[in-house]
Design a protein with these regions (language model features):
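Amphipathic alpha-helical interface segments
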Residues: 14, 18, 143-150
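Amphipathic alpha-helical segments within well-ordered protein domains
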Residues: 66, 94, 148-149
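Arg/Lys-rich, alpha-helical DNA-contact motif
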Residues: 77, 91-92, 121
């Protein structure tokens, strides 16, 4: 398990270096593999494509923050943890969030966080969300995603 995490993080760090000179939309798997000193088979064992590197890393941070809401961590604390993590890797996420591809971390984050809130809020509150409340959750997450890119 630790080795898998180390390999994934090496790919994340390599993508970060490559994004310093090339937009994520233009980075090729072969270039990333060469720079990370891994084979293509290893890359595809862990990731589906270049965007999956950024979305995996974002999900990894969500596992340590927002996904803990309702499990002993409150809403504010979870968000502070996430934003502190994003700030620690600000250069990576600033560049990764620039892509508007459907698979980009920006669009992925918006979708996955909205879905998580739509699931967790009724569990915590003990009542289903109304259609208006669901719309408010989606607007909140879209706005938060937009503000994260600023």
């Amino acid at each position: 398990m630790q080795r898998q995490l180390e390999t994934r993080m090496r790919v994340v760090r390599t993508l970060d270096r490559l994004m310093q000179s090339t937009p994520i939309d233009k980075i090729k798997v072969t270039d990333l593999c060469r720079e990370a000193d891994i084979g293509r088979a290893t890359f595809y064992e862990y990731f589906e494509n270049i965007y999956a590197v950024a979305t995996w890393y974002y999900s990894h941070l969500l596992d340590q923050s927002l996904y803990l809401i309702g499990e002993g961590v409150d809403f504010q604390t979870a968000h502070v943890r996430l934003f502190e993590s994003l700030l620690q890797d600000r250069s990576f996420f600033t560049r990764a969030f620039r892509s508007s591809d459907y698979n980009s971390v920006y669009n992925y984050g918006n979708r996955i966080i909205a879905d998580h809130y739509l699931q967790i809020i009724p569990q915590i509150s003990g009542k289903p969300l109304s259609p208006d409340e669901e719309m408010h959750v989606r607007l909140f997450t879209a706005g938060a995603a937009f503000l994260t890119t600023e």
